[in-house]
Every structure is written in structure tokens, then in C-alpha cells.
């Protein structure tokens, strides 16, 4: 059985918790996109784990995989492995596999990301972790892959090939180009390459073989549908495709092998950073939901903007992902709120739409038809 799990909103829907609950029934859990710009929190007993790269199934018996659609900061991966091992969770190459084709985030990606965001007249709210620039290099065929990181000669040769252009880019943006060939940073990356050599695998081969053997495989997304680089609220989006279809493309699994696509949906809606949020609650009520729901980013610590449930937004996510099931989270956060409200229809220039159109283009001209529920005092 092959199951894909994605967030149906703007991320932070509770995917980590649901994946962790379901993972006991799966043999393999794979992450298929994003980087350490998104995180999820998993609680086991009294222990709280904040993850940014390693899939949630690491705490159970599943084999966990990081696919080639991910952009990976090897330093962050090393920190997560160290965190687990301090808590007695062994993360060896039998437990974790990283695809050889996975692009790595270099220090110059982080530098370029920060410089670019600082130069924008309108900020897009990037986490400045180099994610976007790593994806730019992937598309431009200027990436450094895990297969090269774990091979000293190939890594140094590839870096030398790319360095002149990266130095020019950083200098042109007012940064210090010496970061590209910094000896201490290069030494550290070579050490990380040695550490991860045993983890290298072919994720597509592993997943297809597992499915052929009748095993259960779960593909886990980061972020949410409406942050998708193509279908999201551009330019306030992430740098990768967050919808279910990209799981097949990024993991190298044919779409006819998909059995279930599960939507993770929060009973209200949140968004981190900039971008449209039609049902946003400004003021005391929004702050109350933010506090009750613990709506602060795992990665950045930034407070999340909160709003009422948005049905047209969800219907668009259903169309984009082809969901077979929906998991509703954080309904308890709304306990005691009276009345509860939700957006049912988006009205644009006198025409009603029950499914979201182009949110960024239409949000300035849209009015929401809200439904009120008086059951907020009930659990």
C-alpha cells in the first residue's frame, strides 16, 4: 500500500503528529520535498522532538528515507541525528537512507538567500536557510549532490567548478565572496560527507521494491498545498511542489501505485509570514487562538497568523491533491469560542465561488460569505 500525506492549507496543519500516529502500520516513511525551512513536532511520552528533515517514522520501526526532491543541509541532518542519539534513539544506515541524488545546501546558498531577501522592497518571508537558492541550482544543473558530498575528490572538483560564479553572485549582491571557498567550511562539509557515506541509497529502487513485496509505504510532505511553488499564492510560496503528485515525481514512483492520499486539515487556518489569508483574525481573538493552539513556528519561532476555517481553500486543495481521506486536527483549540465561523463561499465582483480561484489575484476584490455556528461552548 502506498499512501501520500500532504497539508491542505498553508502548512502547520499537524502532519507530524498524524504521520507519527499512522507510521506504526508502515514499513517505509519517505520525505519527498522541501528542506529545513519547515518543521514538525512529535511528542513521545515526556520527550518532545522538533524535526526539520528526518521523517516522523524515525521513532517507530519504519525505515525512513529522504528523497531526491529534498534540499538537504547536512549540518542540520547531523544535528538531528545527534539529538536522537542523546535520547537513546539510534539513527544508523539501517534506519535512515538518503538518496544519492539529493541536492545539498551549501553555505553560499544561505548567504545568497539572506542577501536577496534583504534587497527586496516587498519581503516574501523567506526563512533565509538557502532553500530557494538550492532549488535554483538544481534547476540550473549547478547543484552539488549527496553522491558528490560523500566522495572527497568529486566534491572538491565540483565546488571548484562552481565557485567562480557563486563568488561573482555574492559580490554583486554586496556580500563577502570568501564564504564560497572558506577552508573551515569546506573541512566541515568533508567531515559531514564521511559521516553520511553509509546512508546513501536509491530511494526509488527501495520504495518500488518495498511495494513489490507487499509492504506499506508512506510519503510525507512538508508545508502545505497553498504554498506550492506552482499552485500556491505566488510569490508568497515555498520553492518546491507540495502537492501529492510531486511525491510520485520526486520519489520515482508511478502514480498508478498510489492507494491513499490523506489531507491534514486544521479546524481553523494559520499562515506564517507574508501572503494572503482571507479569513485572518486581527486582534484579541486571533491572539487567543494563536496562544491556545501554540501557533509558533517549529523552525523560526515566529507567531502564526490565525483565521477562521476556509472551505473554498480546502476544496481547491482537494482538487489539486485528489484526497481520499481527511484528517481534522486541533478542533479542541476552538473549545469555548462562541460563535464559531467559517468561510463557505468567496464572492468576487458579484459572482460566488465555492472553490478557490487565484487567491493572490482575487483576494483584494473578494468578499467571504461566512457561516456562524453557536456550538463553540461544546467540546
UniProtKB/Swiss-Prot annotation:
One cellular-component annotation, GO: cytoplasm
Reactions catalysed according to its record: IMP + L-aspartate + GTP = N(6)-(1,2-dicarboxyethyl)-AMP + GDP + phosphate + 2 H(+)
Cofactor section: Mg(2+)
Amino acids binding Mg(2+): 12, 39
Record bears the keyword Magnesium: yes
Subcellular location: Cytoplasm
Family, per entry: Belongs to the adenylosuccinate synthetase family.
Official protein name in the record: Adenylosuccinate synthetase
Gene: purA
Amino acid at each position: 500500500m502506498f499512501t501520500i500525506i500532504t497539508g491542505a492549507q498553508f502548512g502547520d496543519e499537524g502532519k507530524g503528529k498524524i504521520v507519527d500516529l499512522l507510521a506504526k502500520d508502515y514499513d517505509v516513511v519517505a520525505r519527498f520535498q522541501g528542506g529545513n525551512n519547515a518543521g514538525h513536532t512529535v511528542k513521545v511520552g515526556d520527550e518532545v522532538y522538533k524535526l526539520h528533515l528526518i521523517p516522523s517514522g524515525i521513532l517507530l520501526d519504519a525505515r525512513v528515507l529522504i528523497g531526491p526532491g529534498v534540499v538537504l543541509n547536512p549540518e542540520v541532518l547531523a544535528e538531528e541525528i545527534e539529538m536522537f542519539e542523546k535520547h537513546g534513539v539510534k539513527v544508523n544506515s539501517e534506519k535512515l537512507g538518503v538518496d544519492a541524488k539529493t541536492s545539498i545546501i551549501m553555505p553560499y546558498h544561505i548567504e545568497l538567500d539572506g542577501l536577496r531577501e534583504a534587497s527586496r522592497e516587498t519581503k516574501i518571508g523567506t526563512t533565509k536557510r538557502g532553500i530557494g537558492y538550492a532549488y535554483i541550482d538544481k534547476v540550473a544543473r549547478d547543484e552539488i549532490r549527496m553522491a558528490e558530498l560523500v566522495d572527497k575528490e568529486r566534491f572538491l572538483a565540483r565546488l571548484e567548478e562552481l565557485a567562480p560564479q557563486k563568488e561573482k553572485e555574492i559580490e554583486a549582491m554586496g556580500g563577502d565572496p570568501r564564504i564560497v571557498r572558506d577552508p573551515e567550511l569546506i573541512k566541515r562539509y568533508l567531515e559531514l560527507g564521511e559521516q553520511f557515506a553509509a546512508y546513501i541509497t536509491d530511494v526509488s529502487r527501495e520504495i518500488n521494491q518495498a511495494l513489490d513485496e507487499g509492504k506499506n509505504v508512506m510519503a510525507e510532505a512538508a508545508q502545505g498545498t497553498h504554498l506550492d511553488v506552482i499552485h500556491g499564492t505566488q510569490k508568497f510560496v515555498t520553492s518546491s511542489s507540495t502537492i501529492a503528485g510531486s511525491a510520485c515525481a520526486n520519489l520515482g514512483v508511478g502514480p498508478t501505485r498510489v492507494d491513499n492520499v490523506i489531507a491534514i486539515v486544521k479546524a481553523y487556518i494559520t499562515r506564517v509570514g507574508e501572503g494572503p489569508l482571507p479569513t485572518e483574525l486581527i486582534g484579541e481573538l486571533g491572539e487567543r487562538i494563536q496562544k491556545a493552539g501554540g501557533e509558533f513556528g517549529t523552525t523560526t519561532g515566529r507567531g502564526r497568523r490565525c483565521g477562521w476555517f476556509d472551505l473554498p481553500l480546502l476544496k481547491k486543495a482537494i482538487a489539486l491533491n485528489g484526497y481520499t481521506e481527511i484528517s481534522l486536527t486541533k478542533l479542541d483549540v476552538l473549545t469555548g469560542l462562541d460563535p464559531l465561523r467559517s468561510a463557505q463561499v468567496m464572492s468576487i465582483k458579484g459572482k460566488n465561488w465555492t472553490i478557490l480561484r487565484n487567491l493572490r489575484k482575487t483576494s483584494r476584490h473578494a468578499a467571504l460569505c461566512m457561516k456562524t455556528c453557536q456550538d463553540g461552548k461544546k467540546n
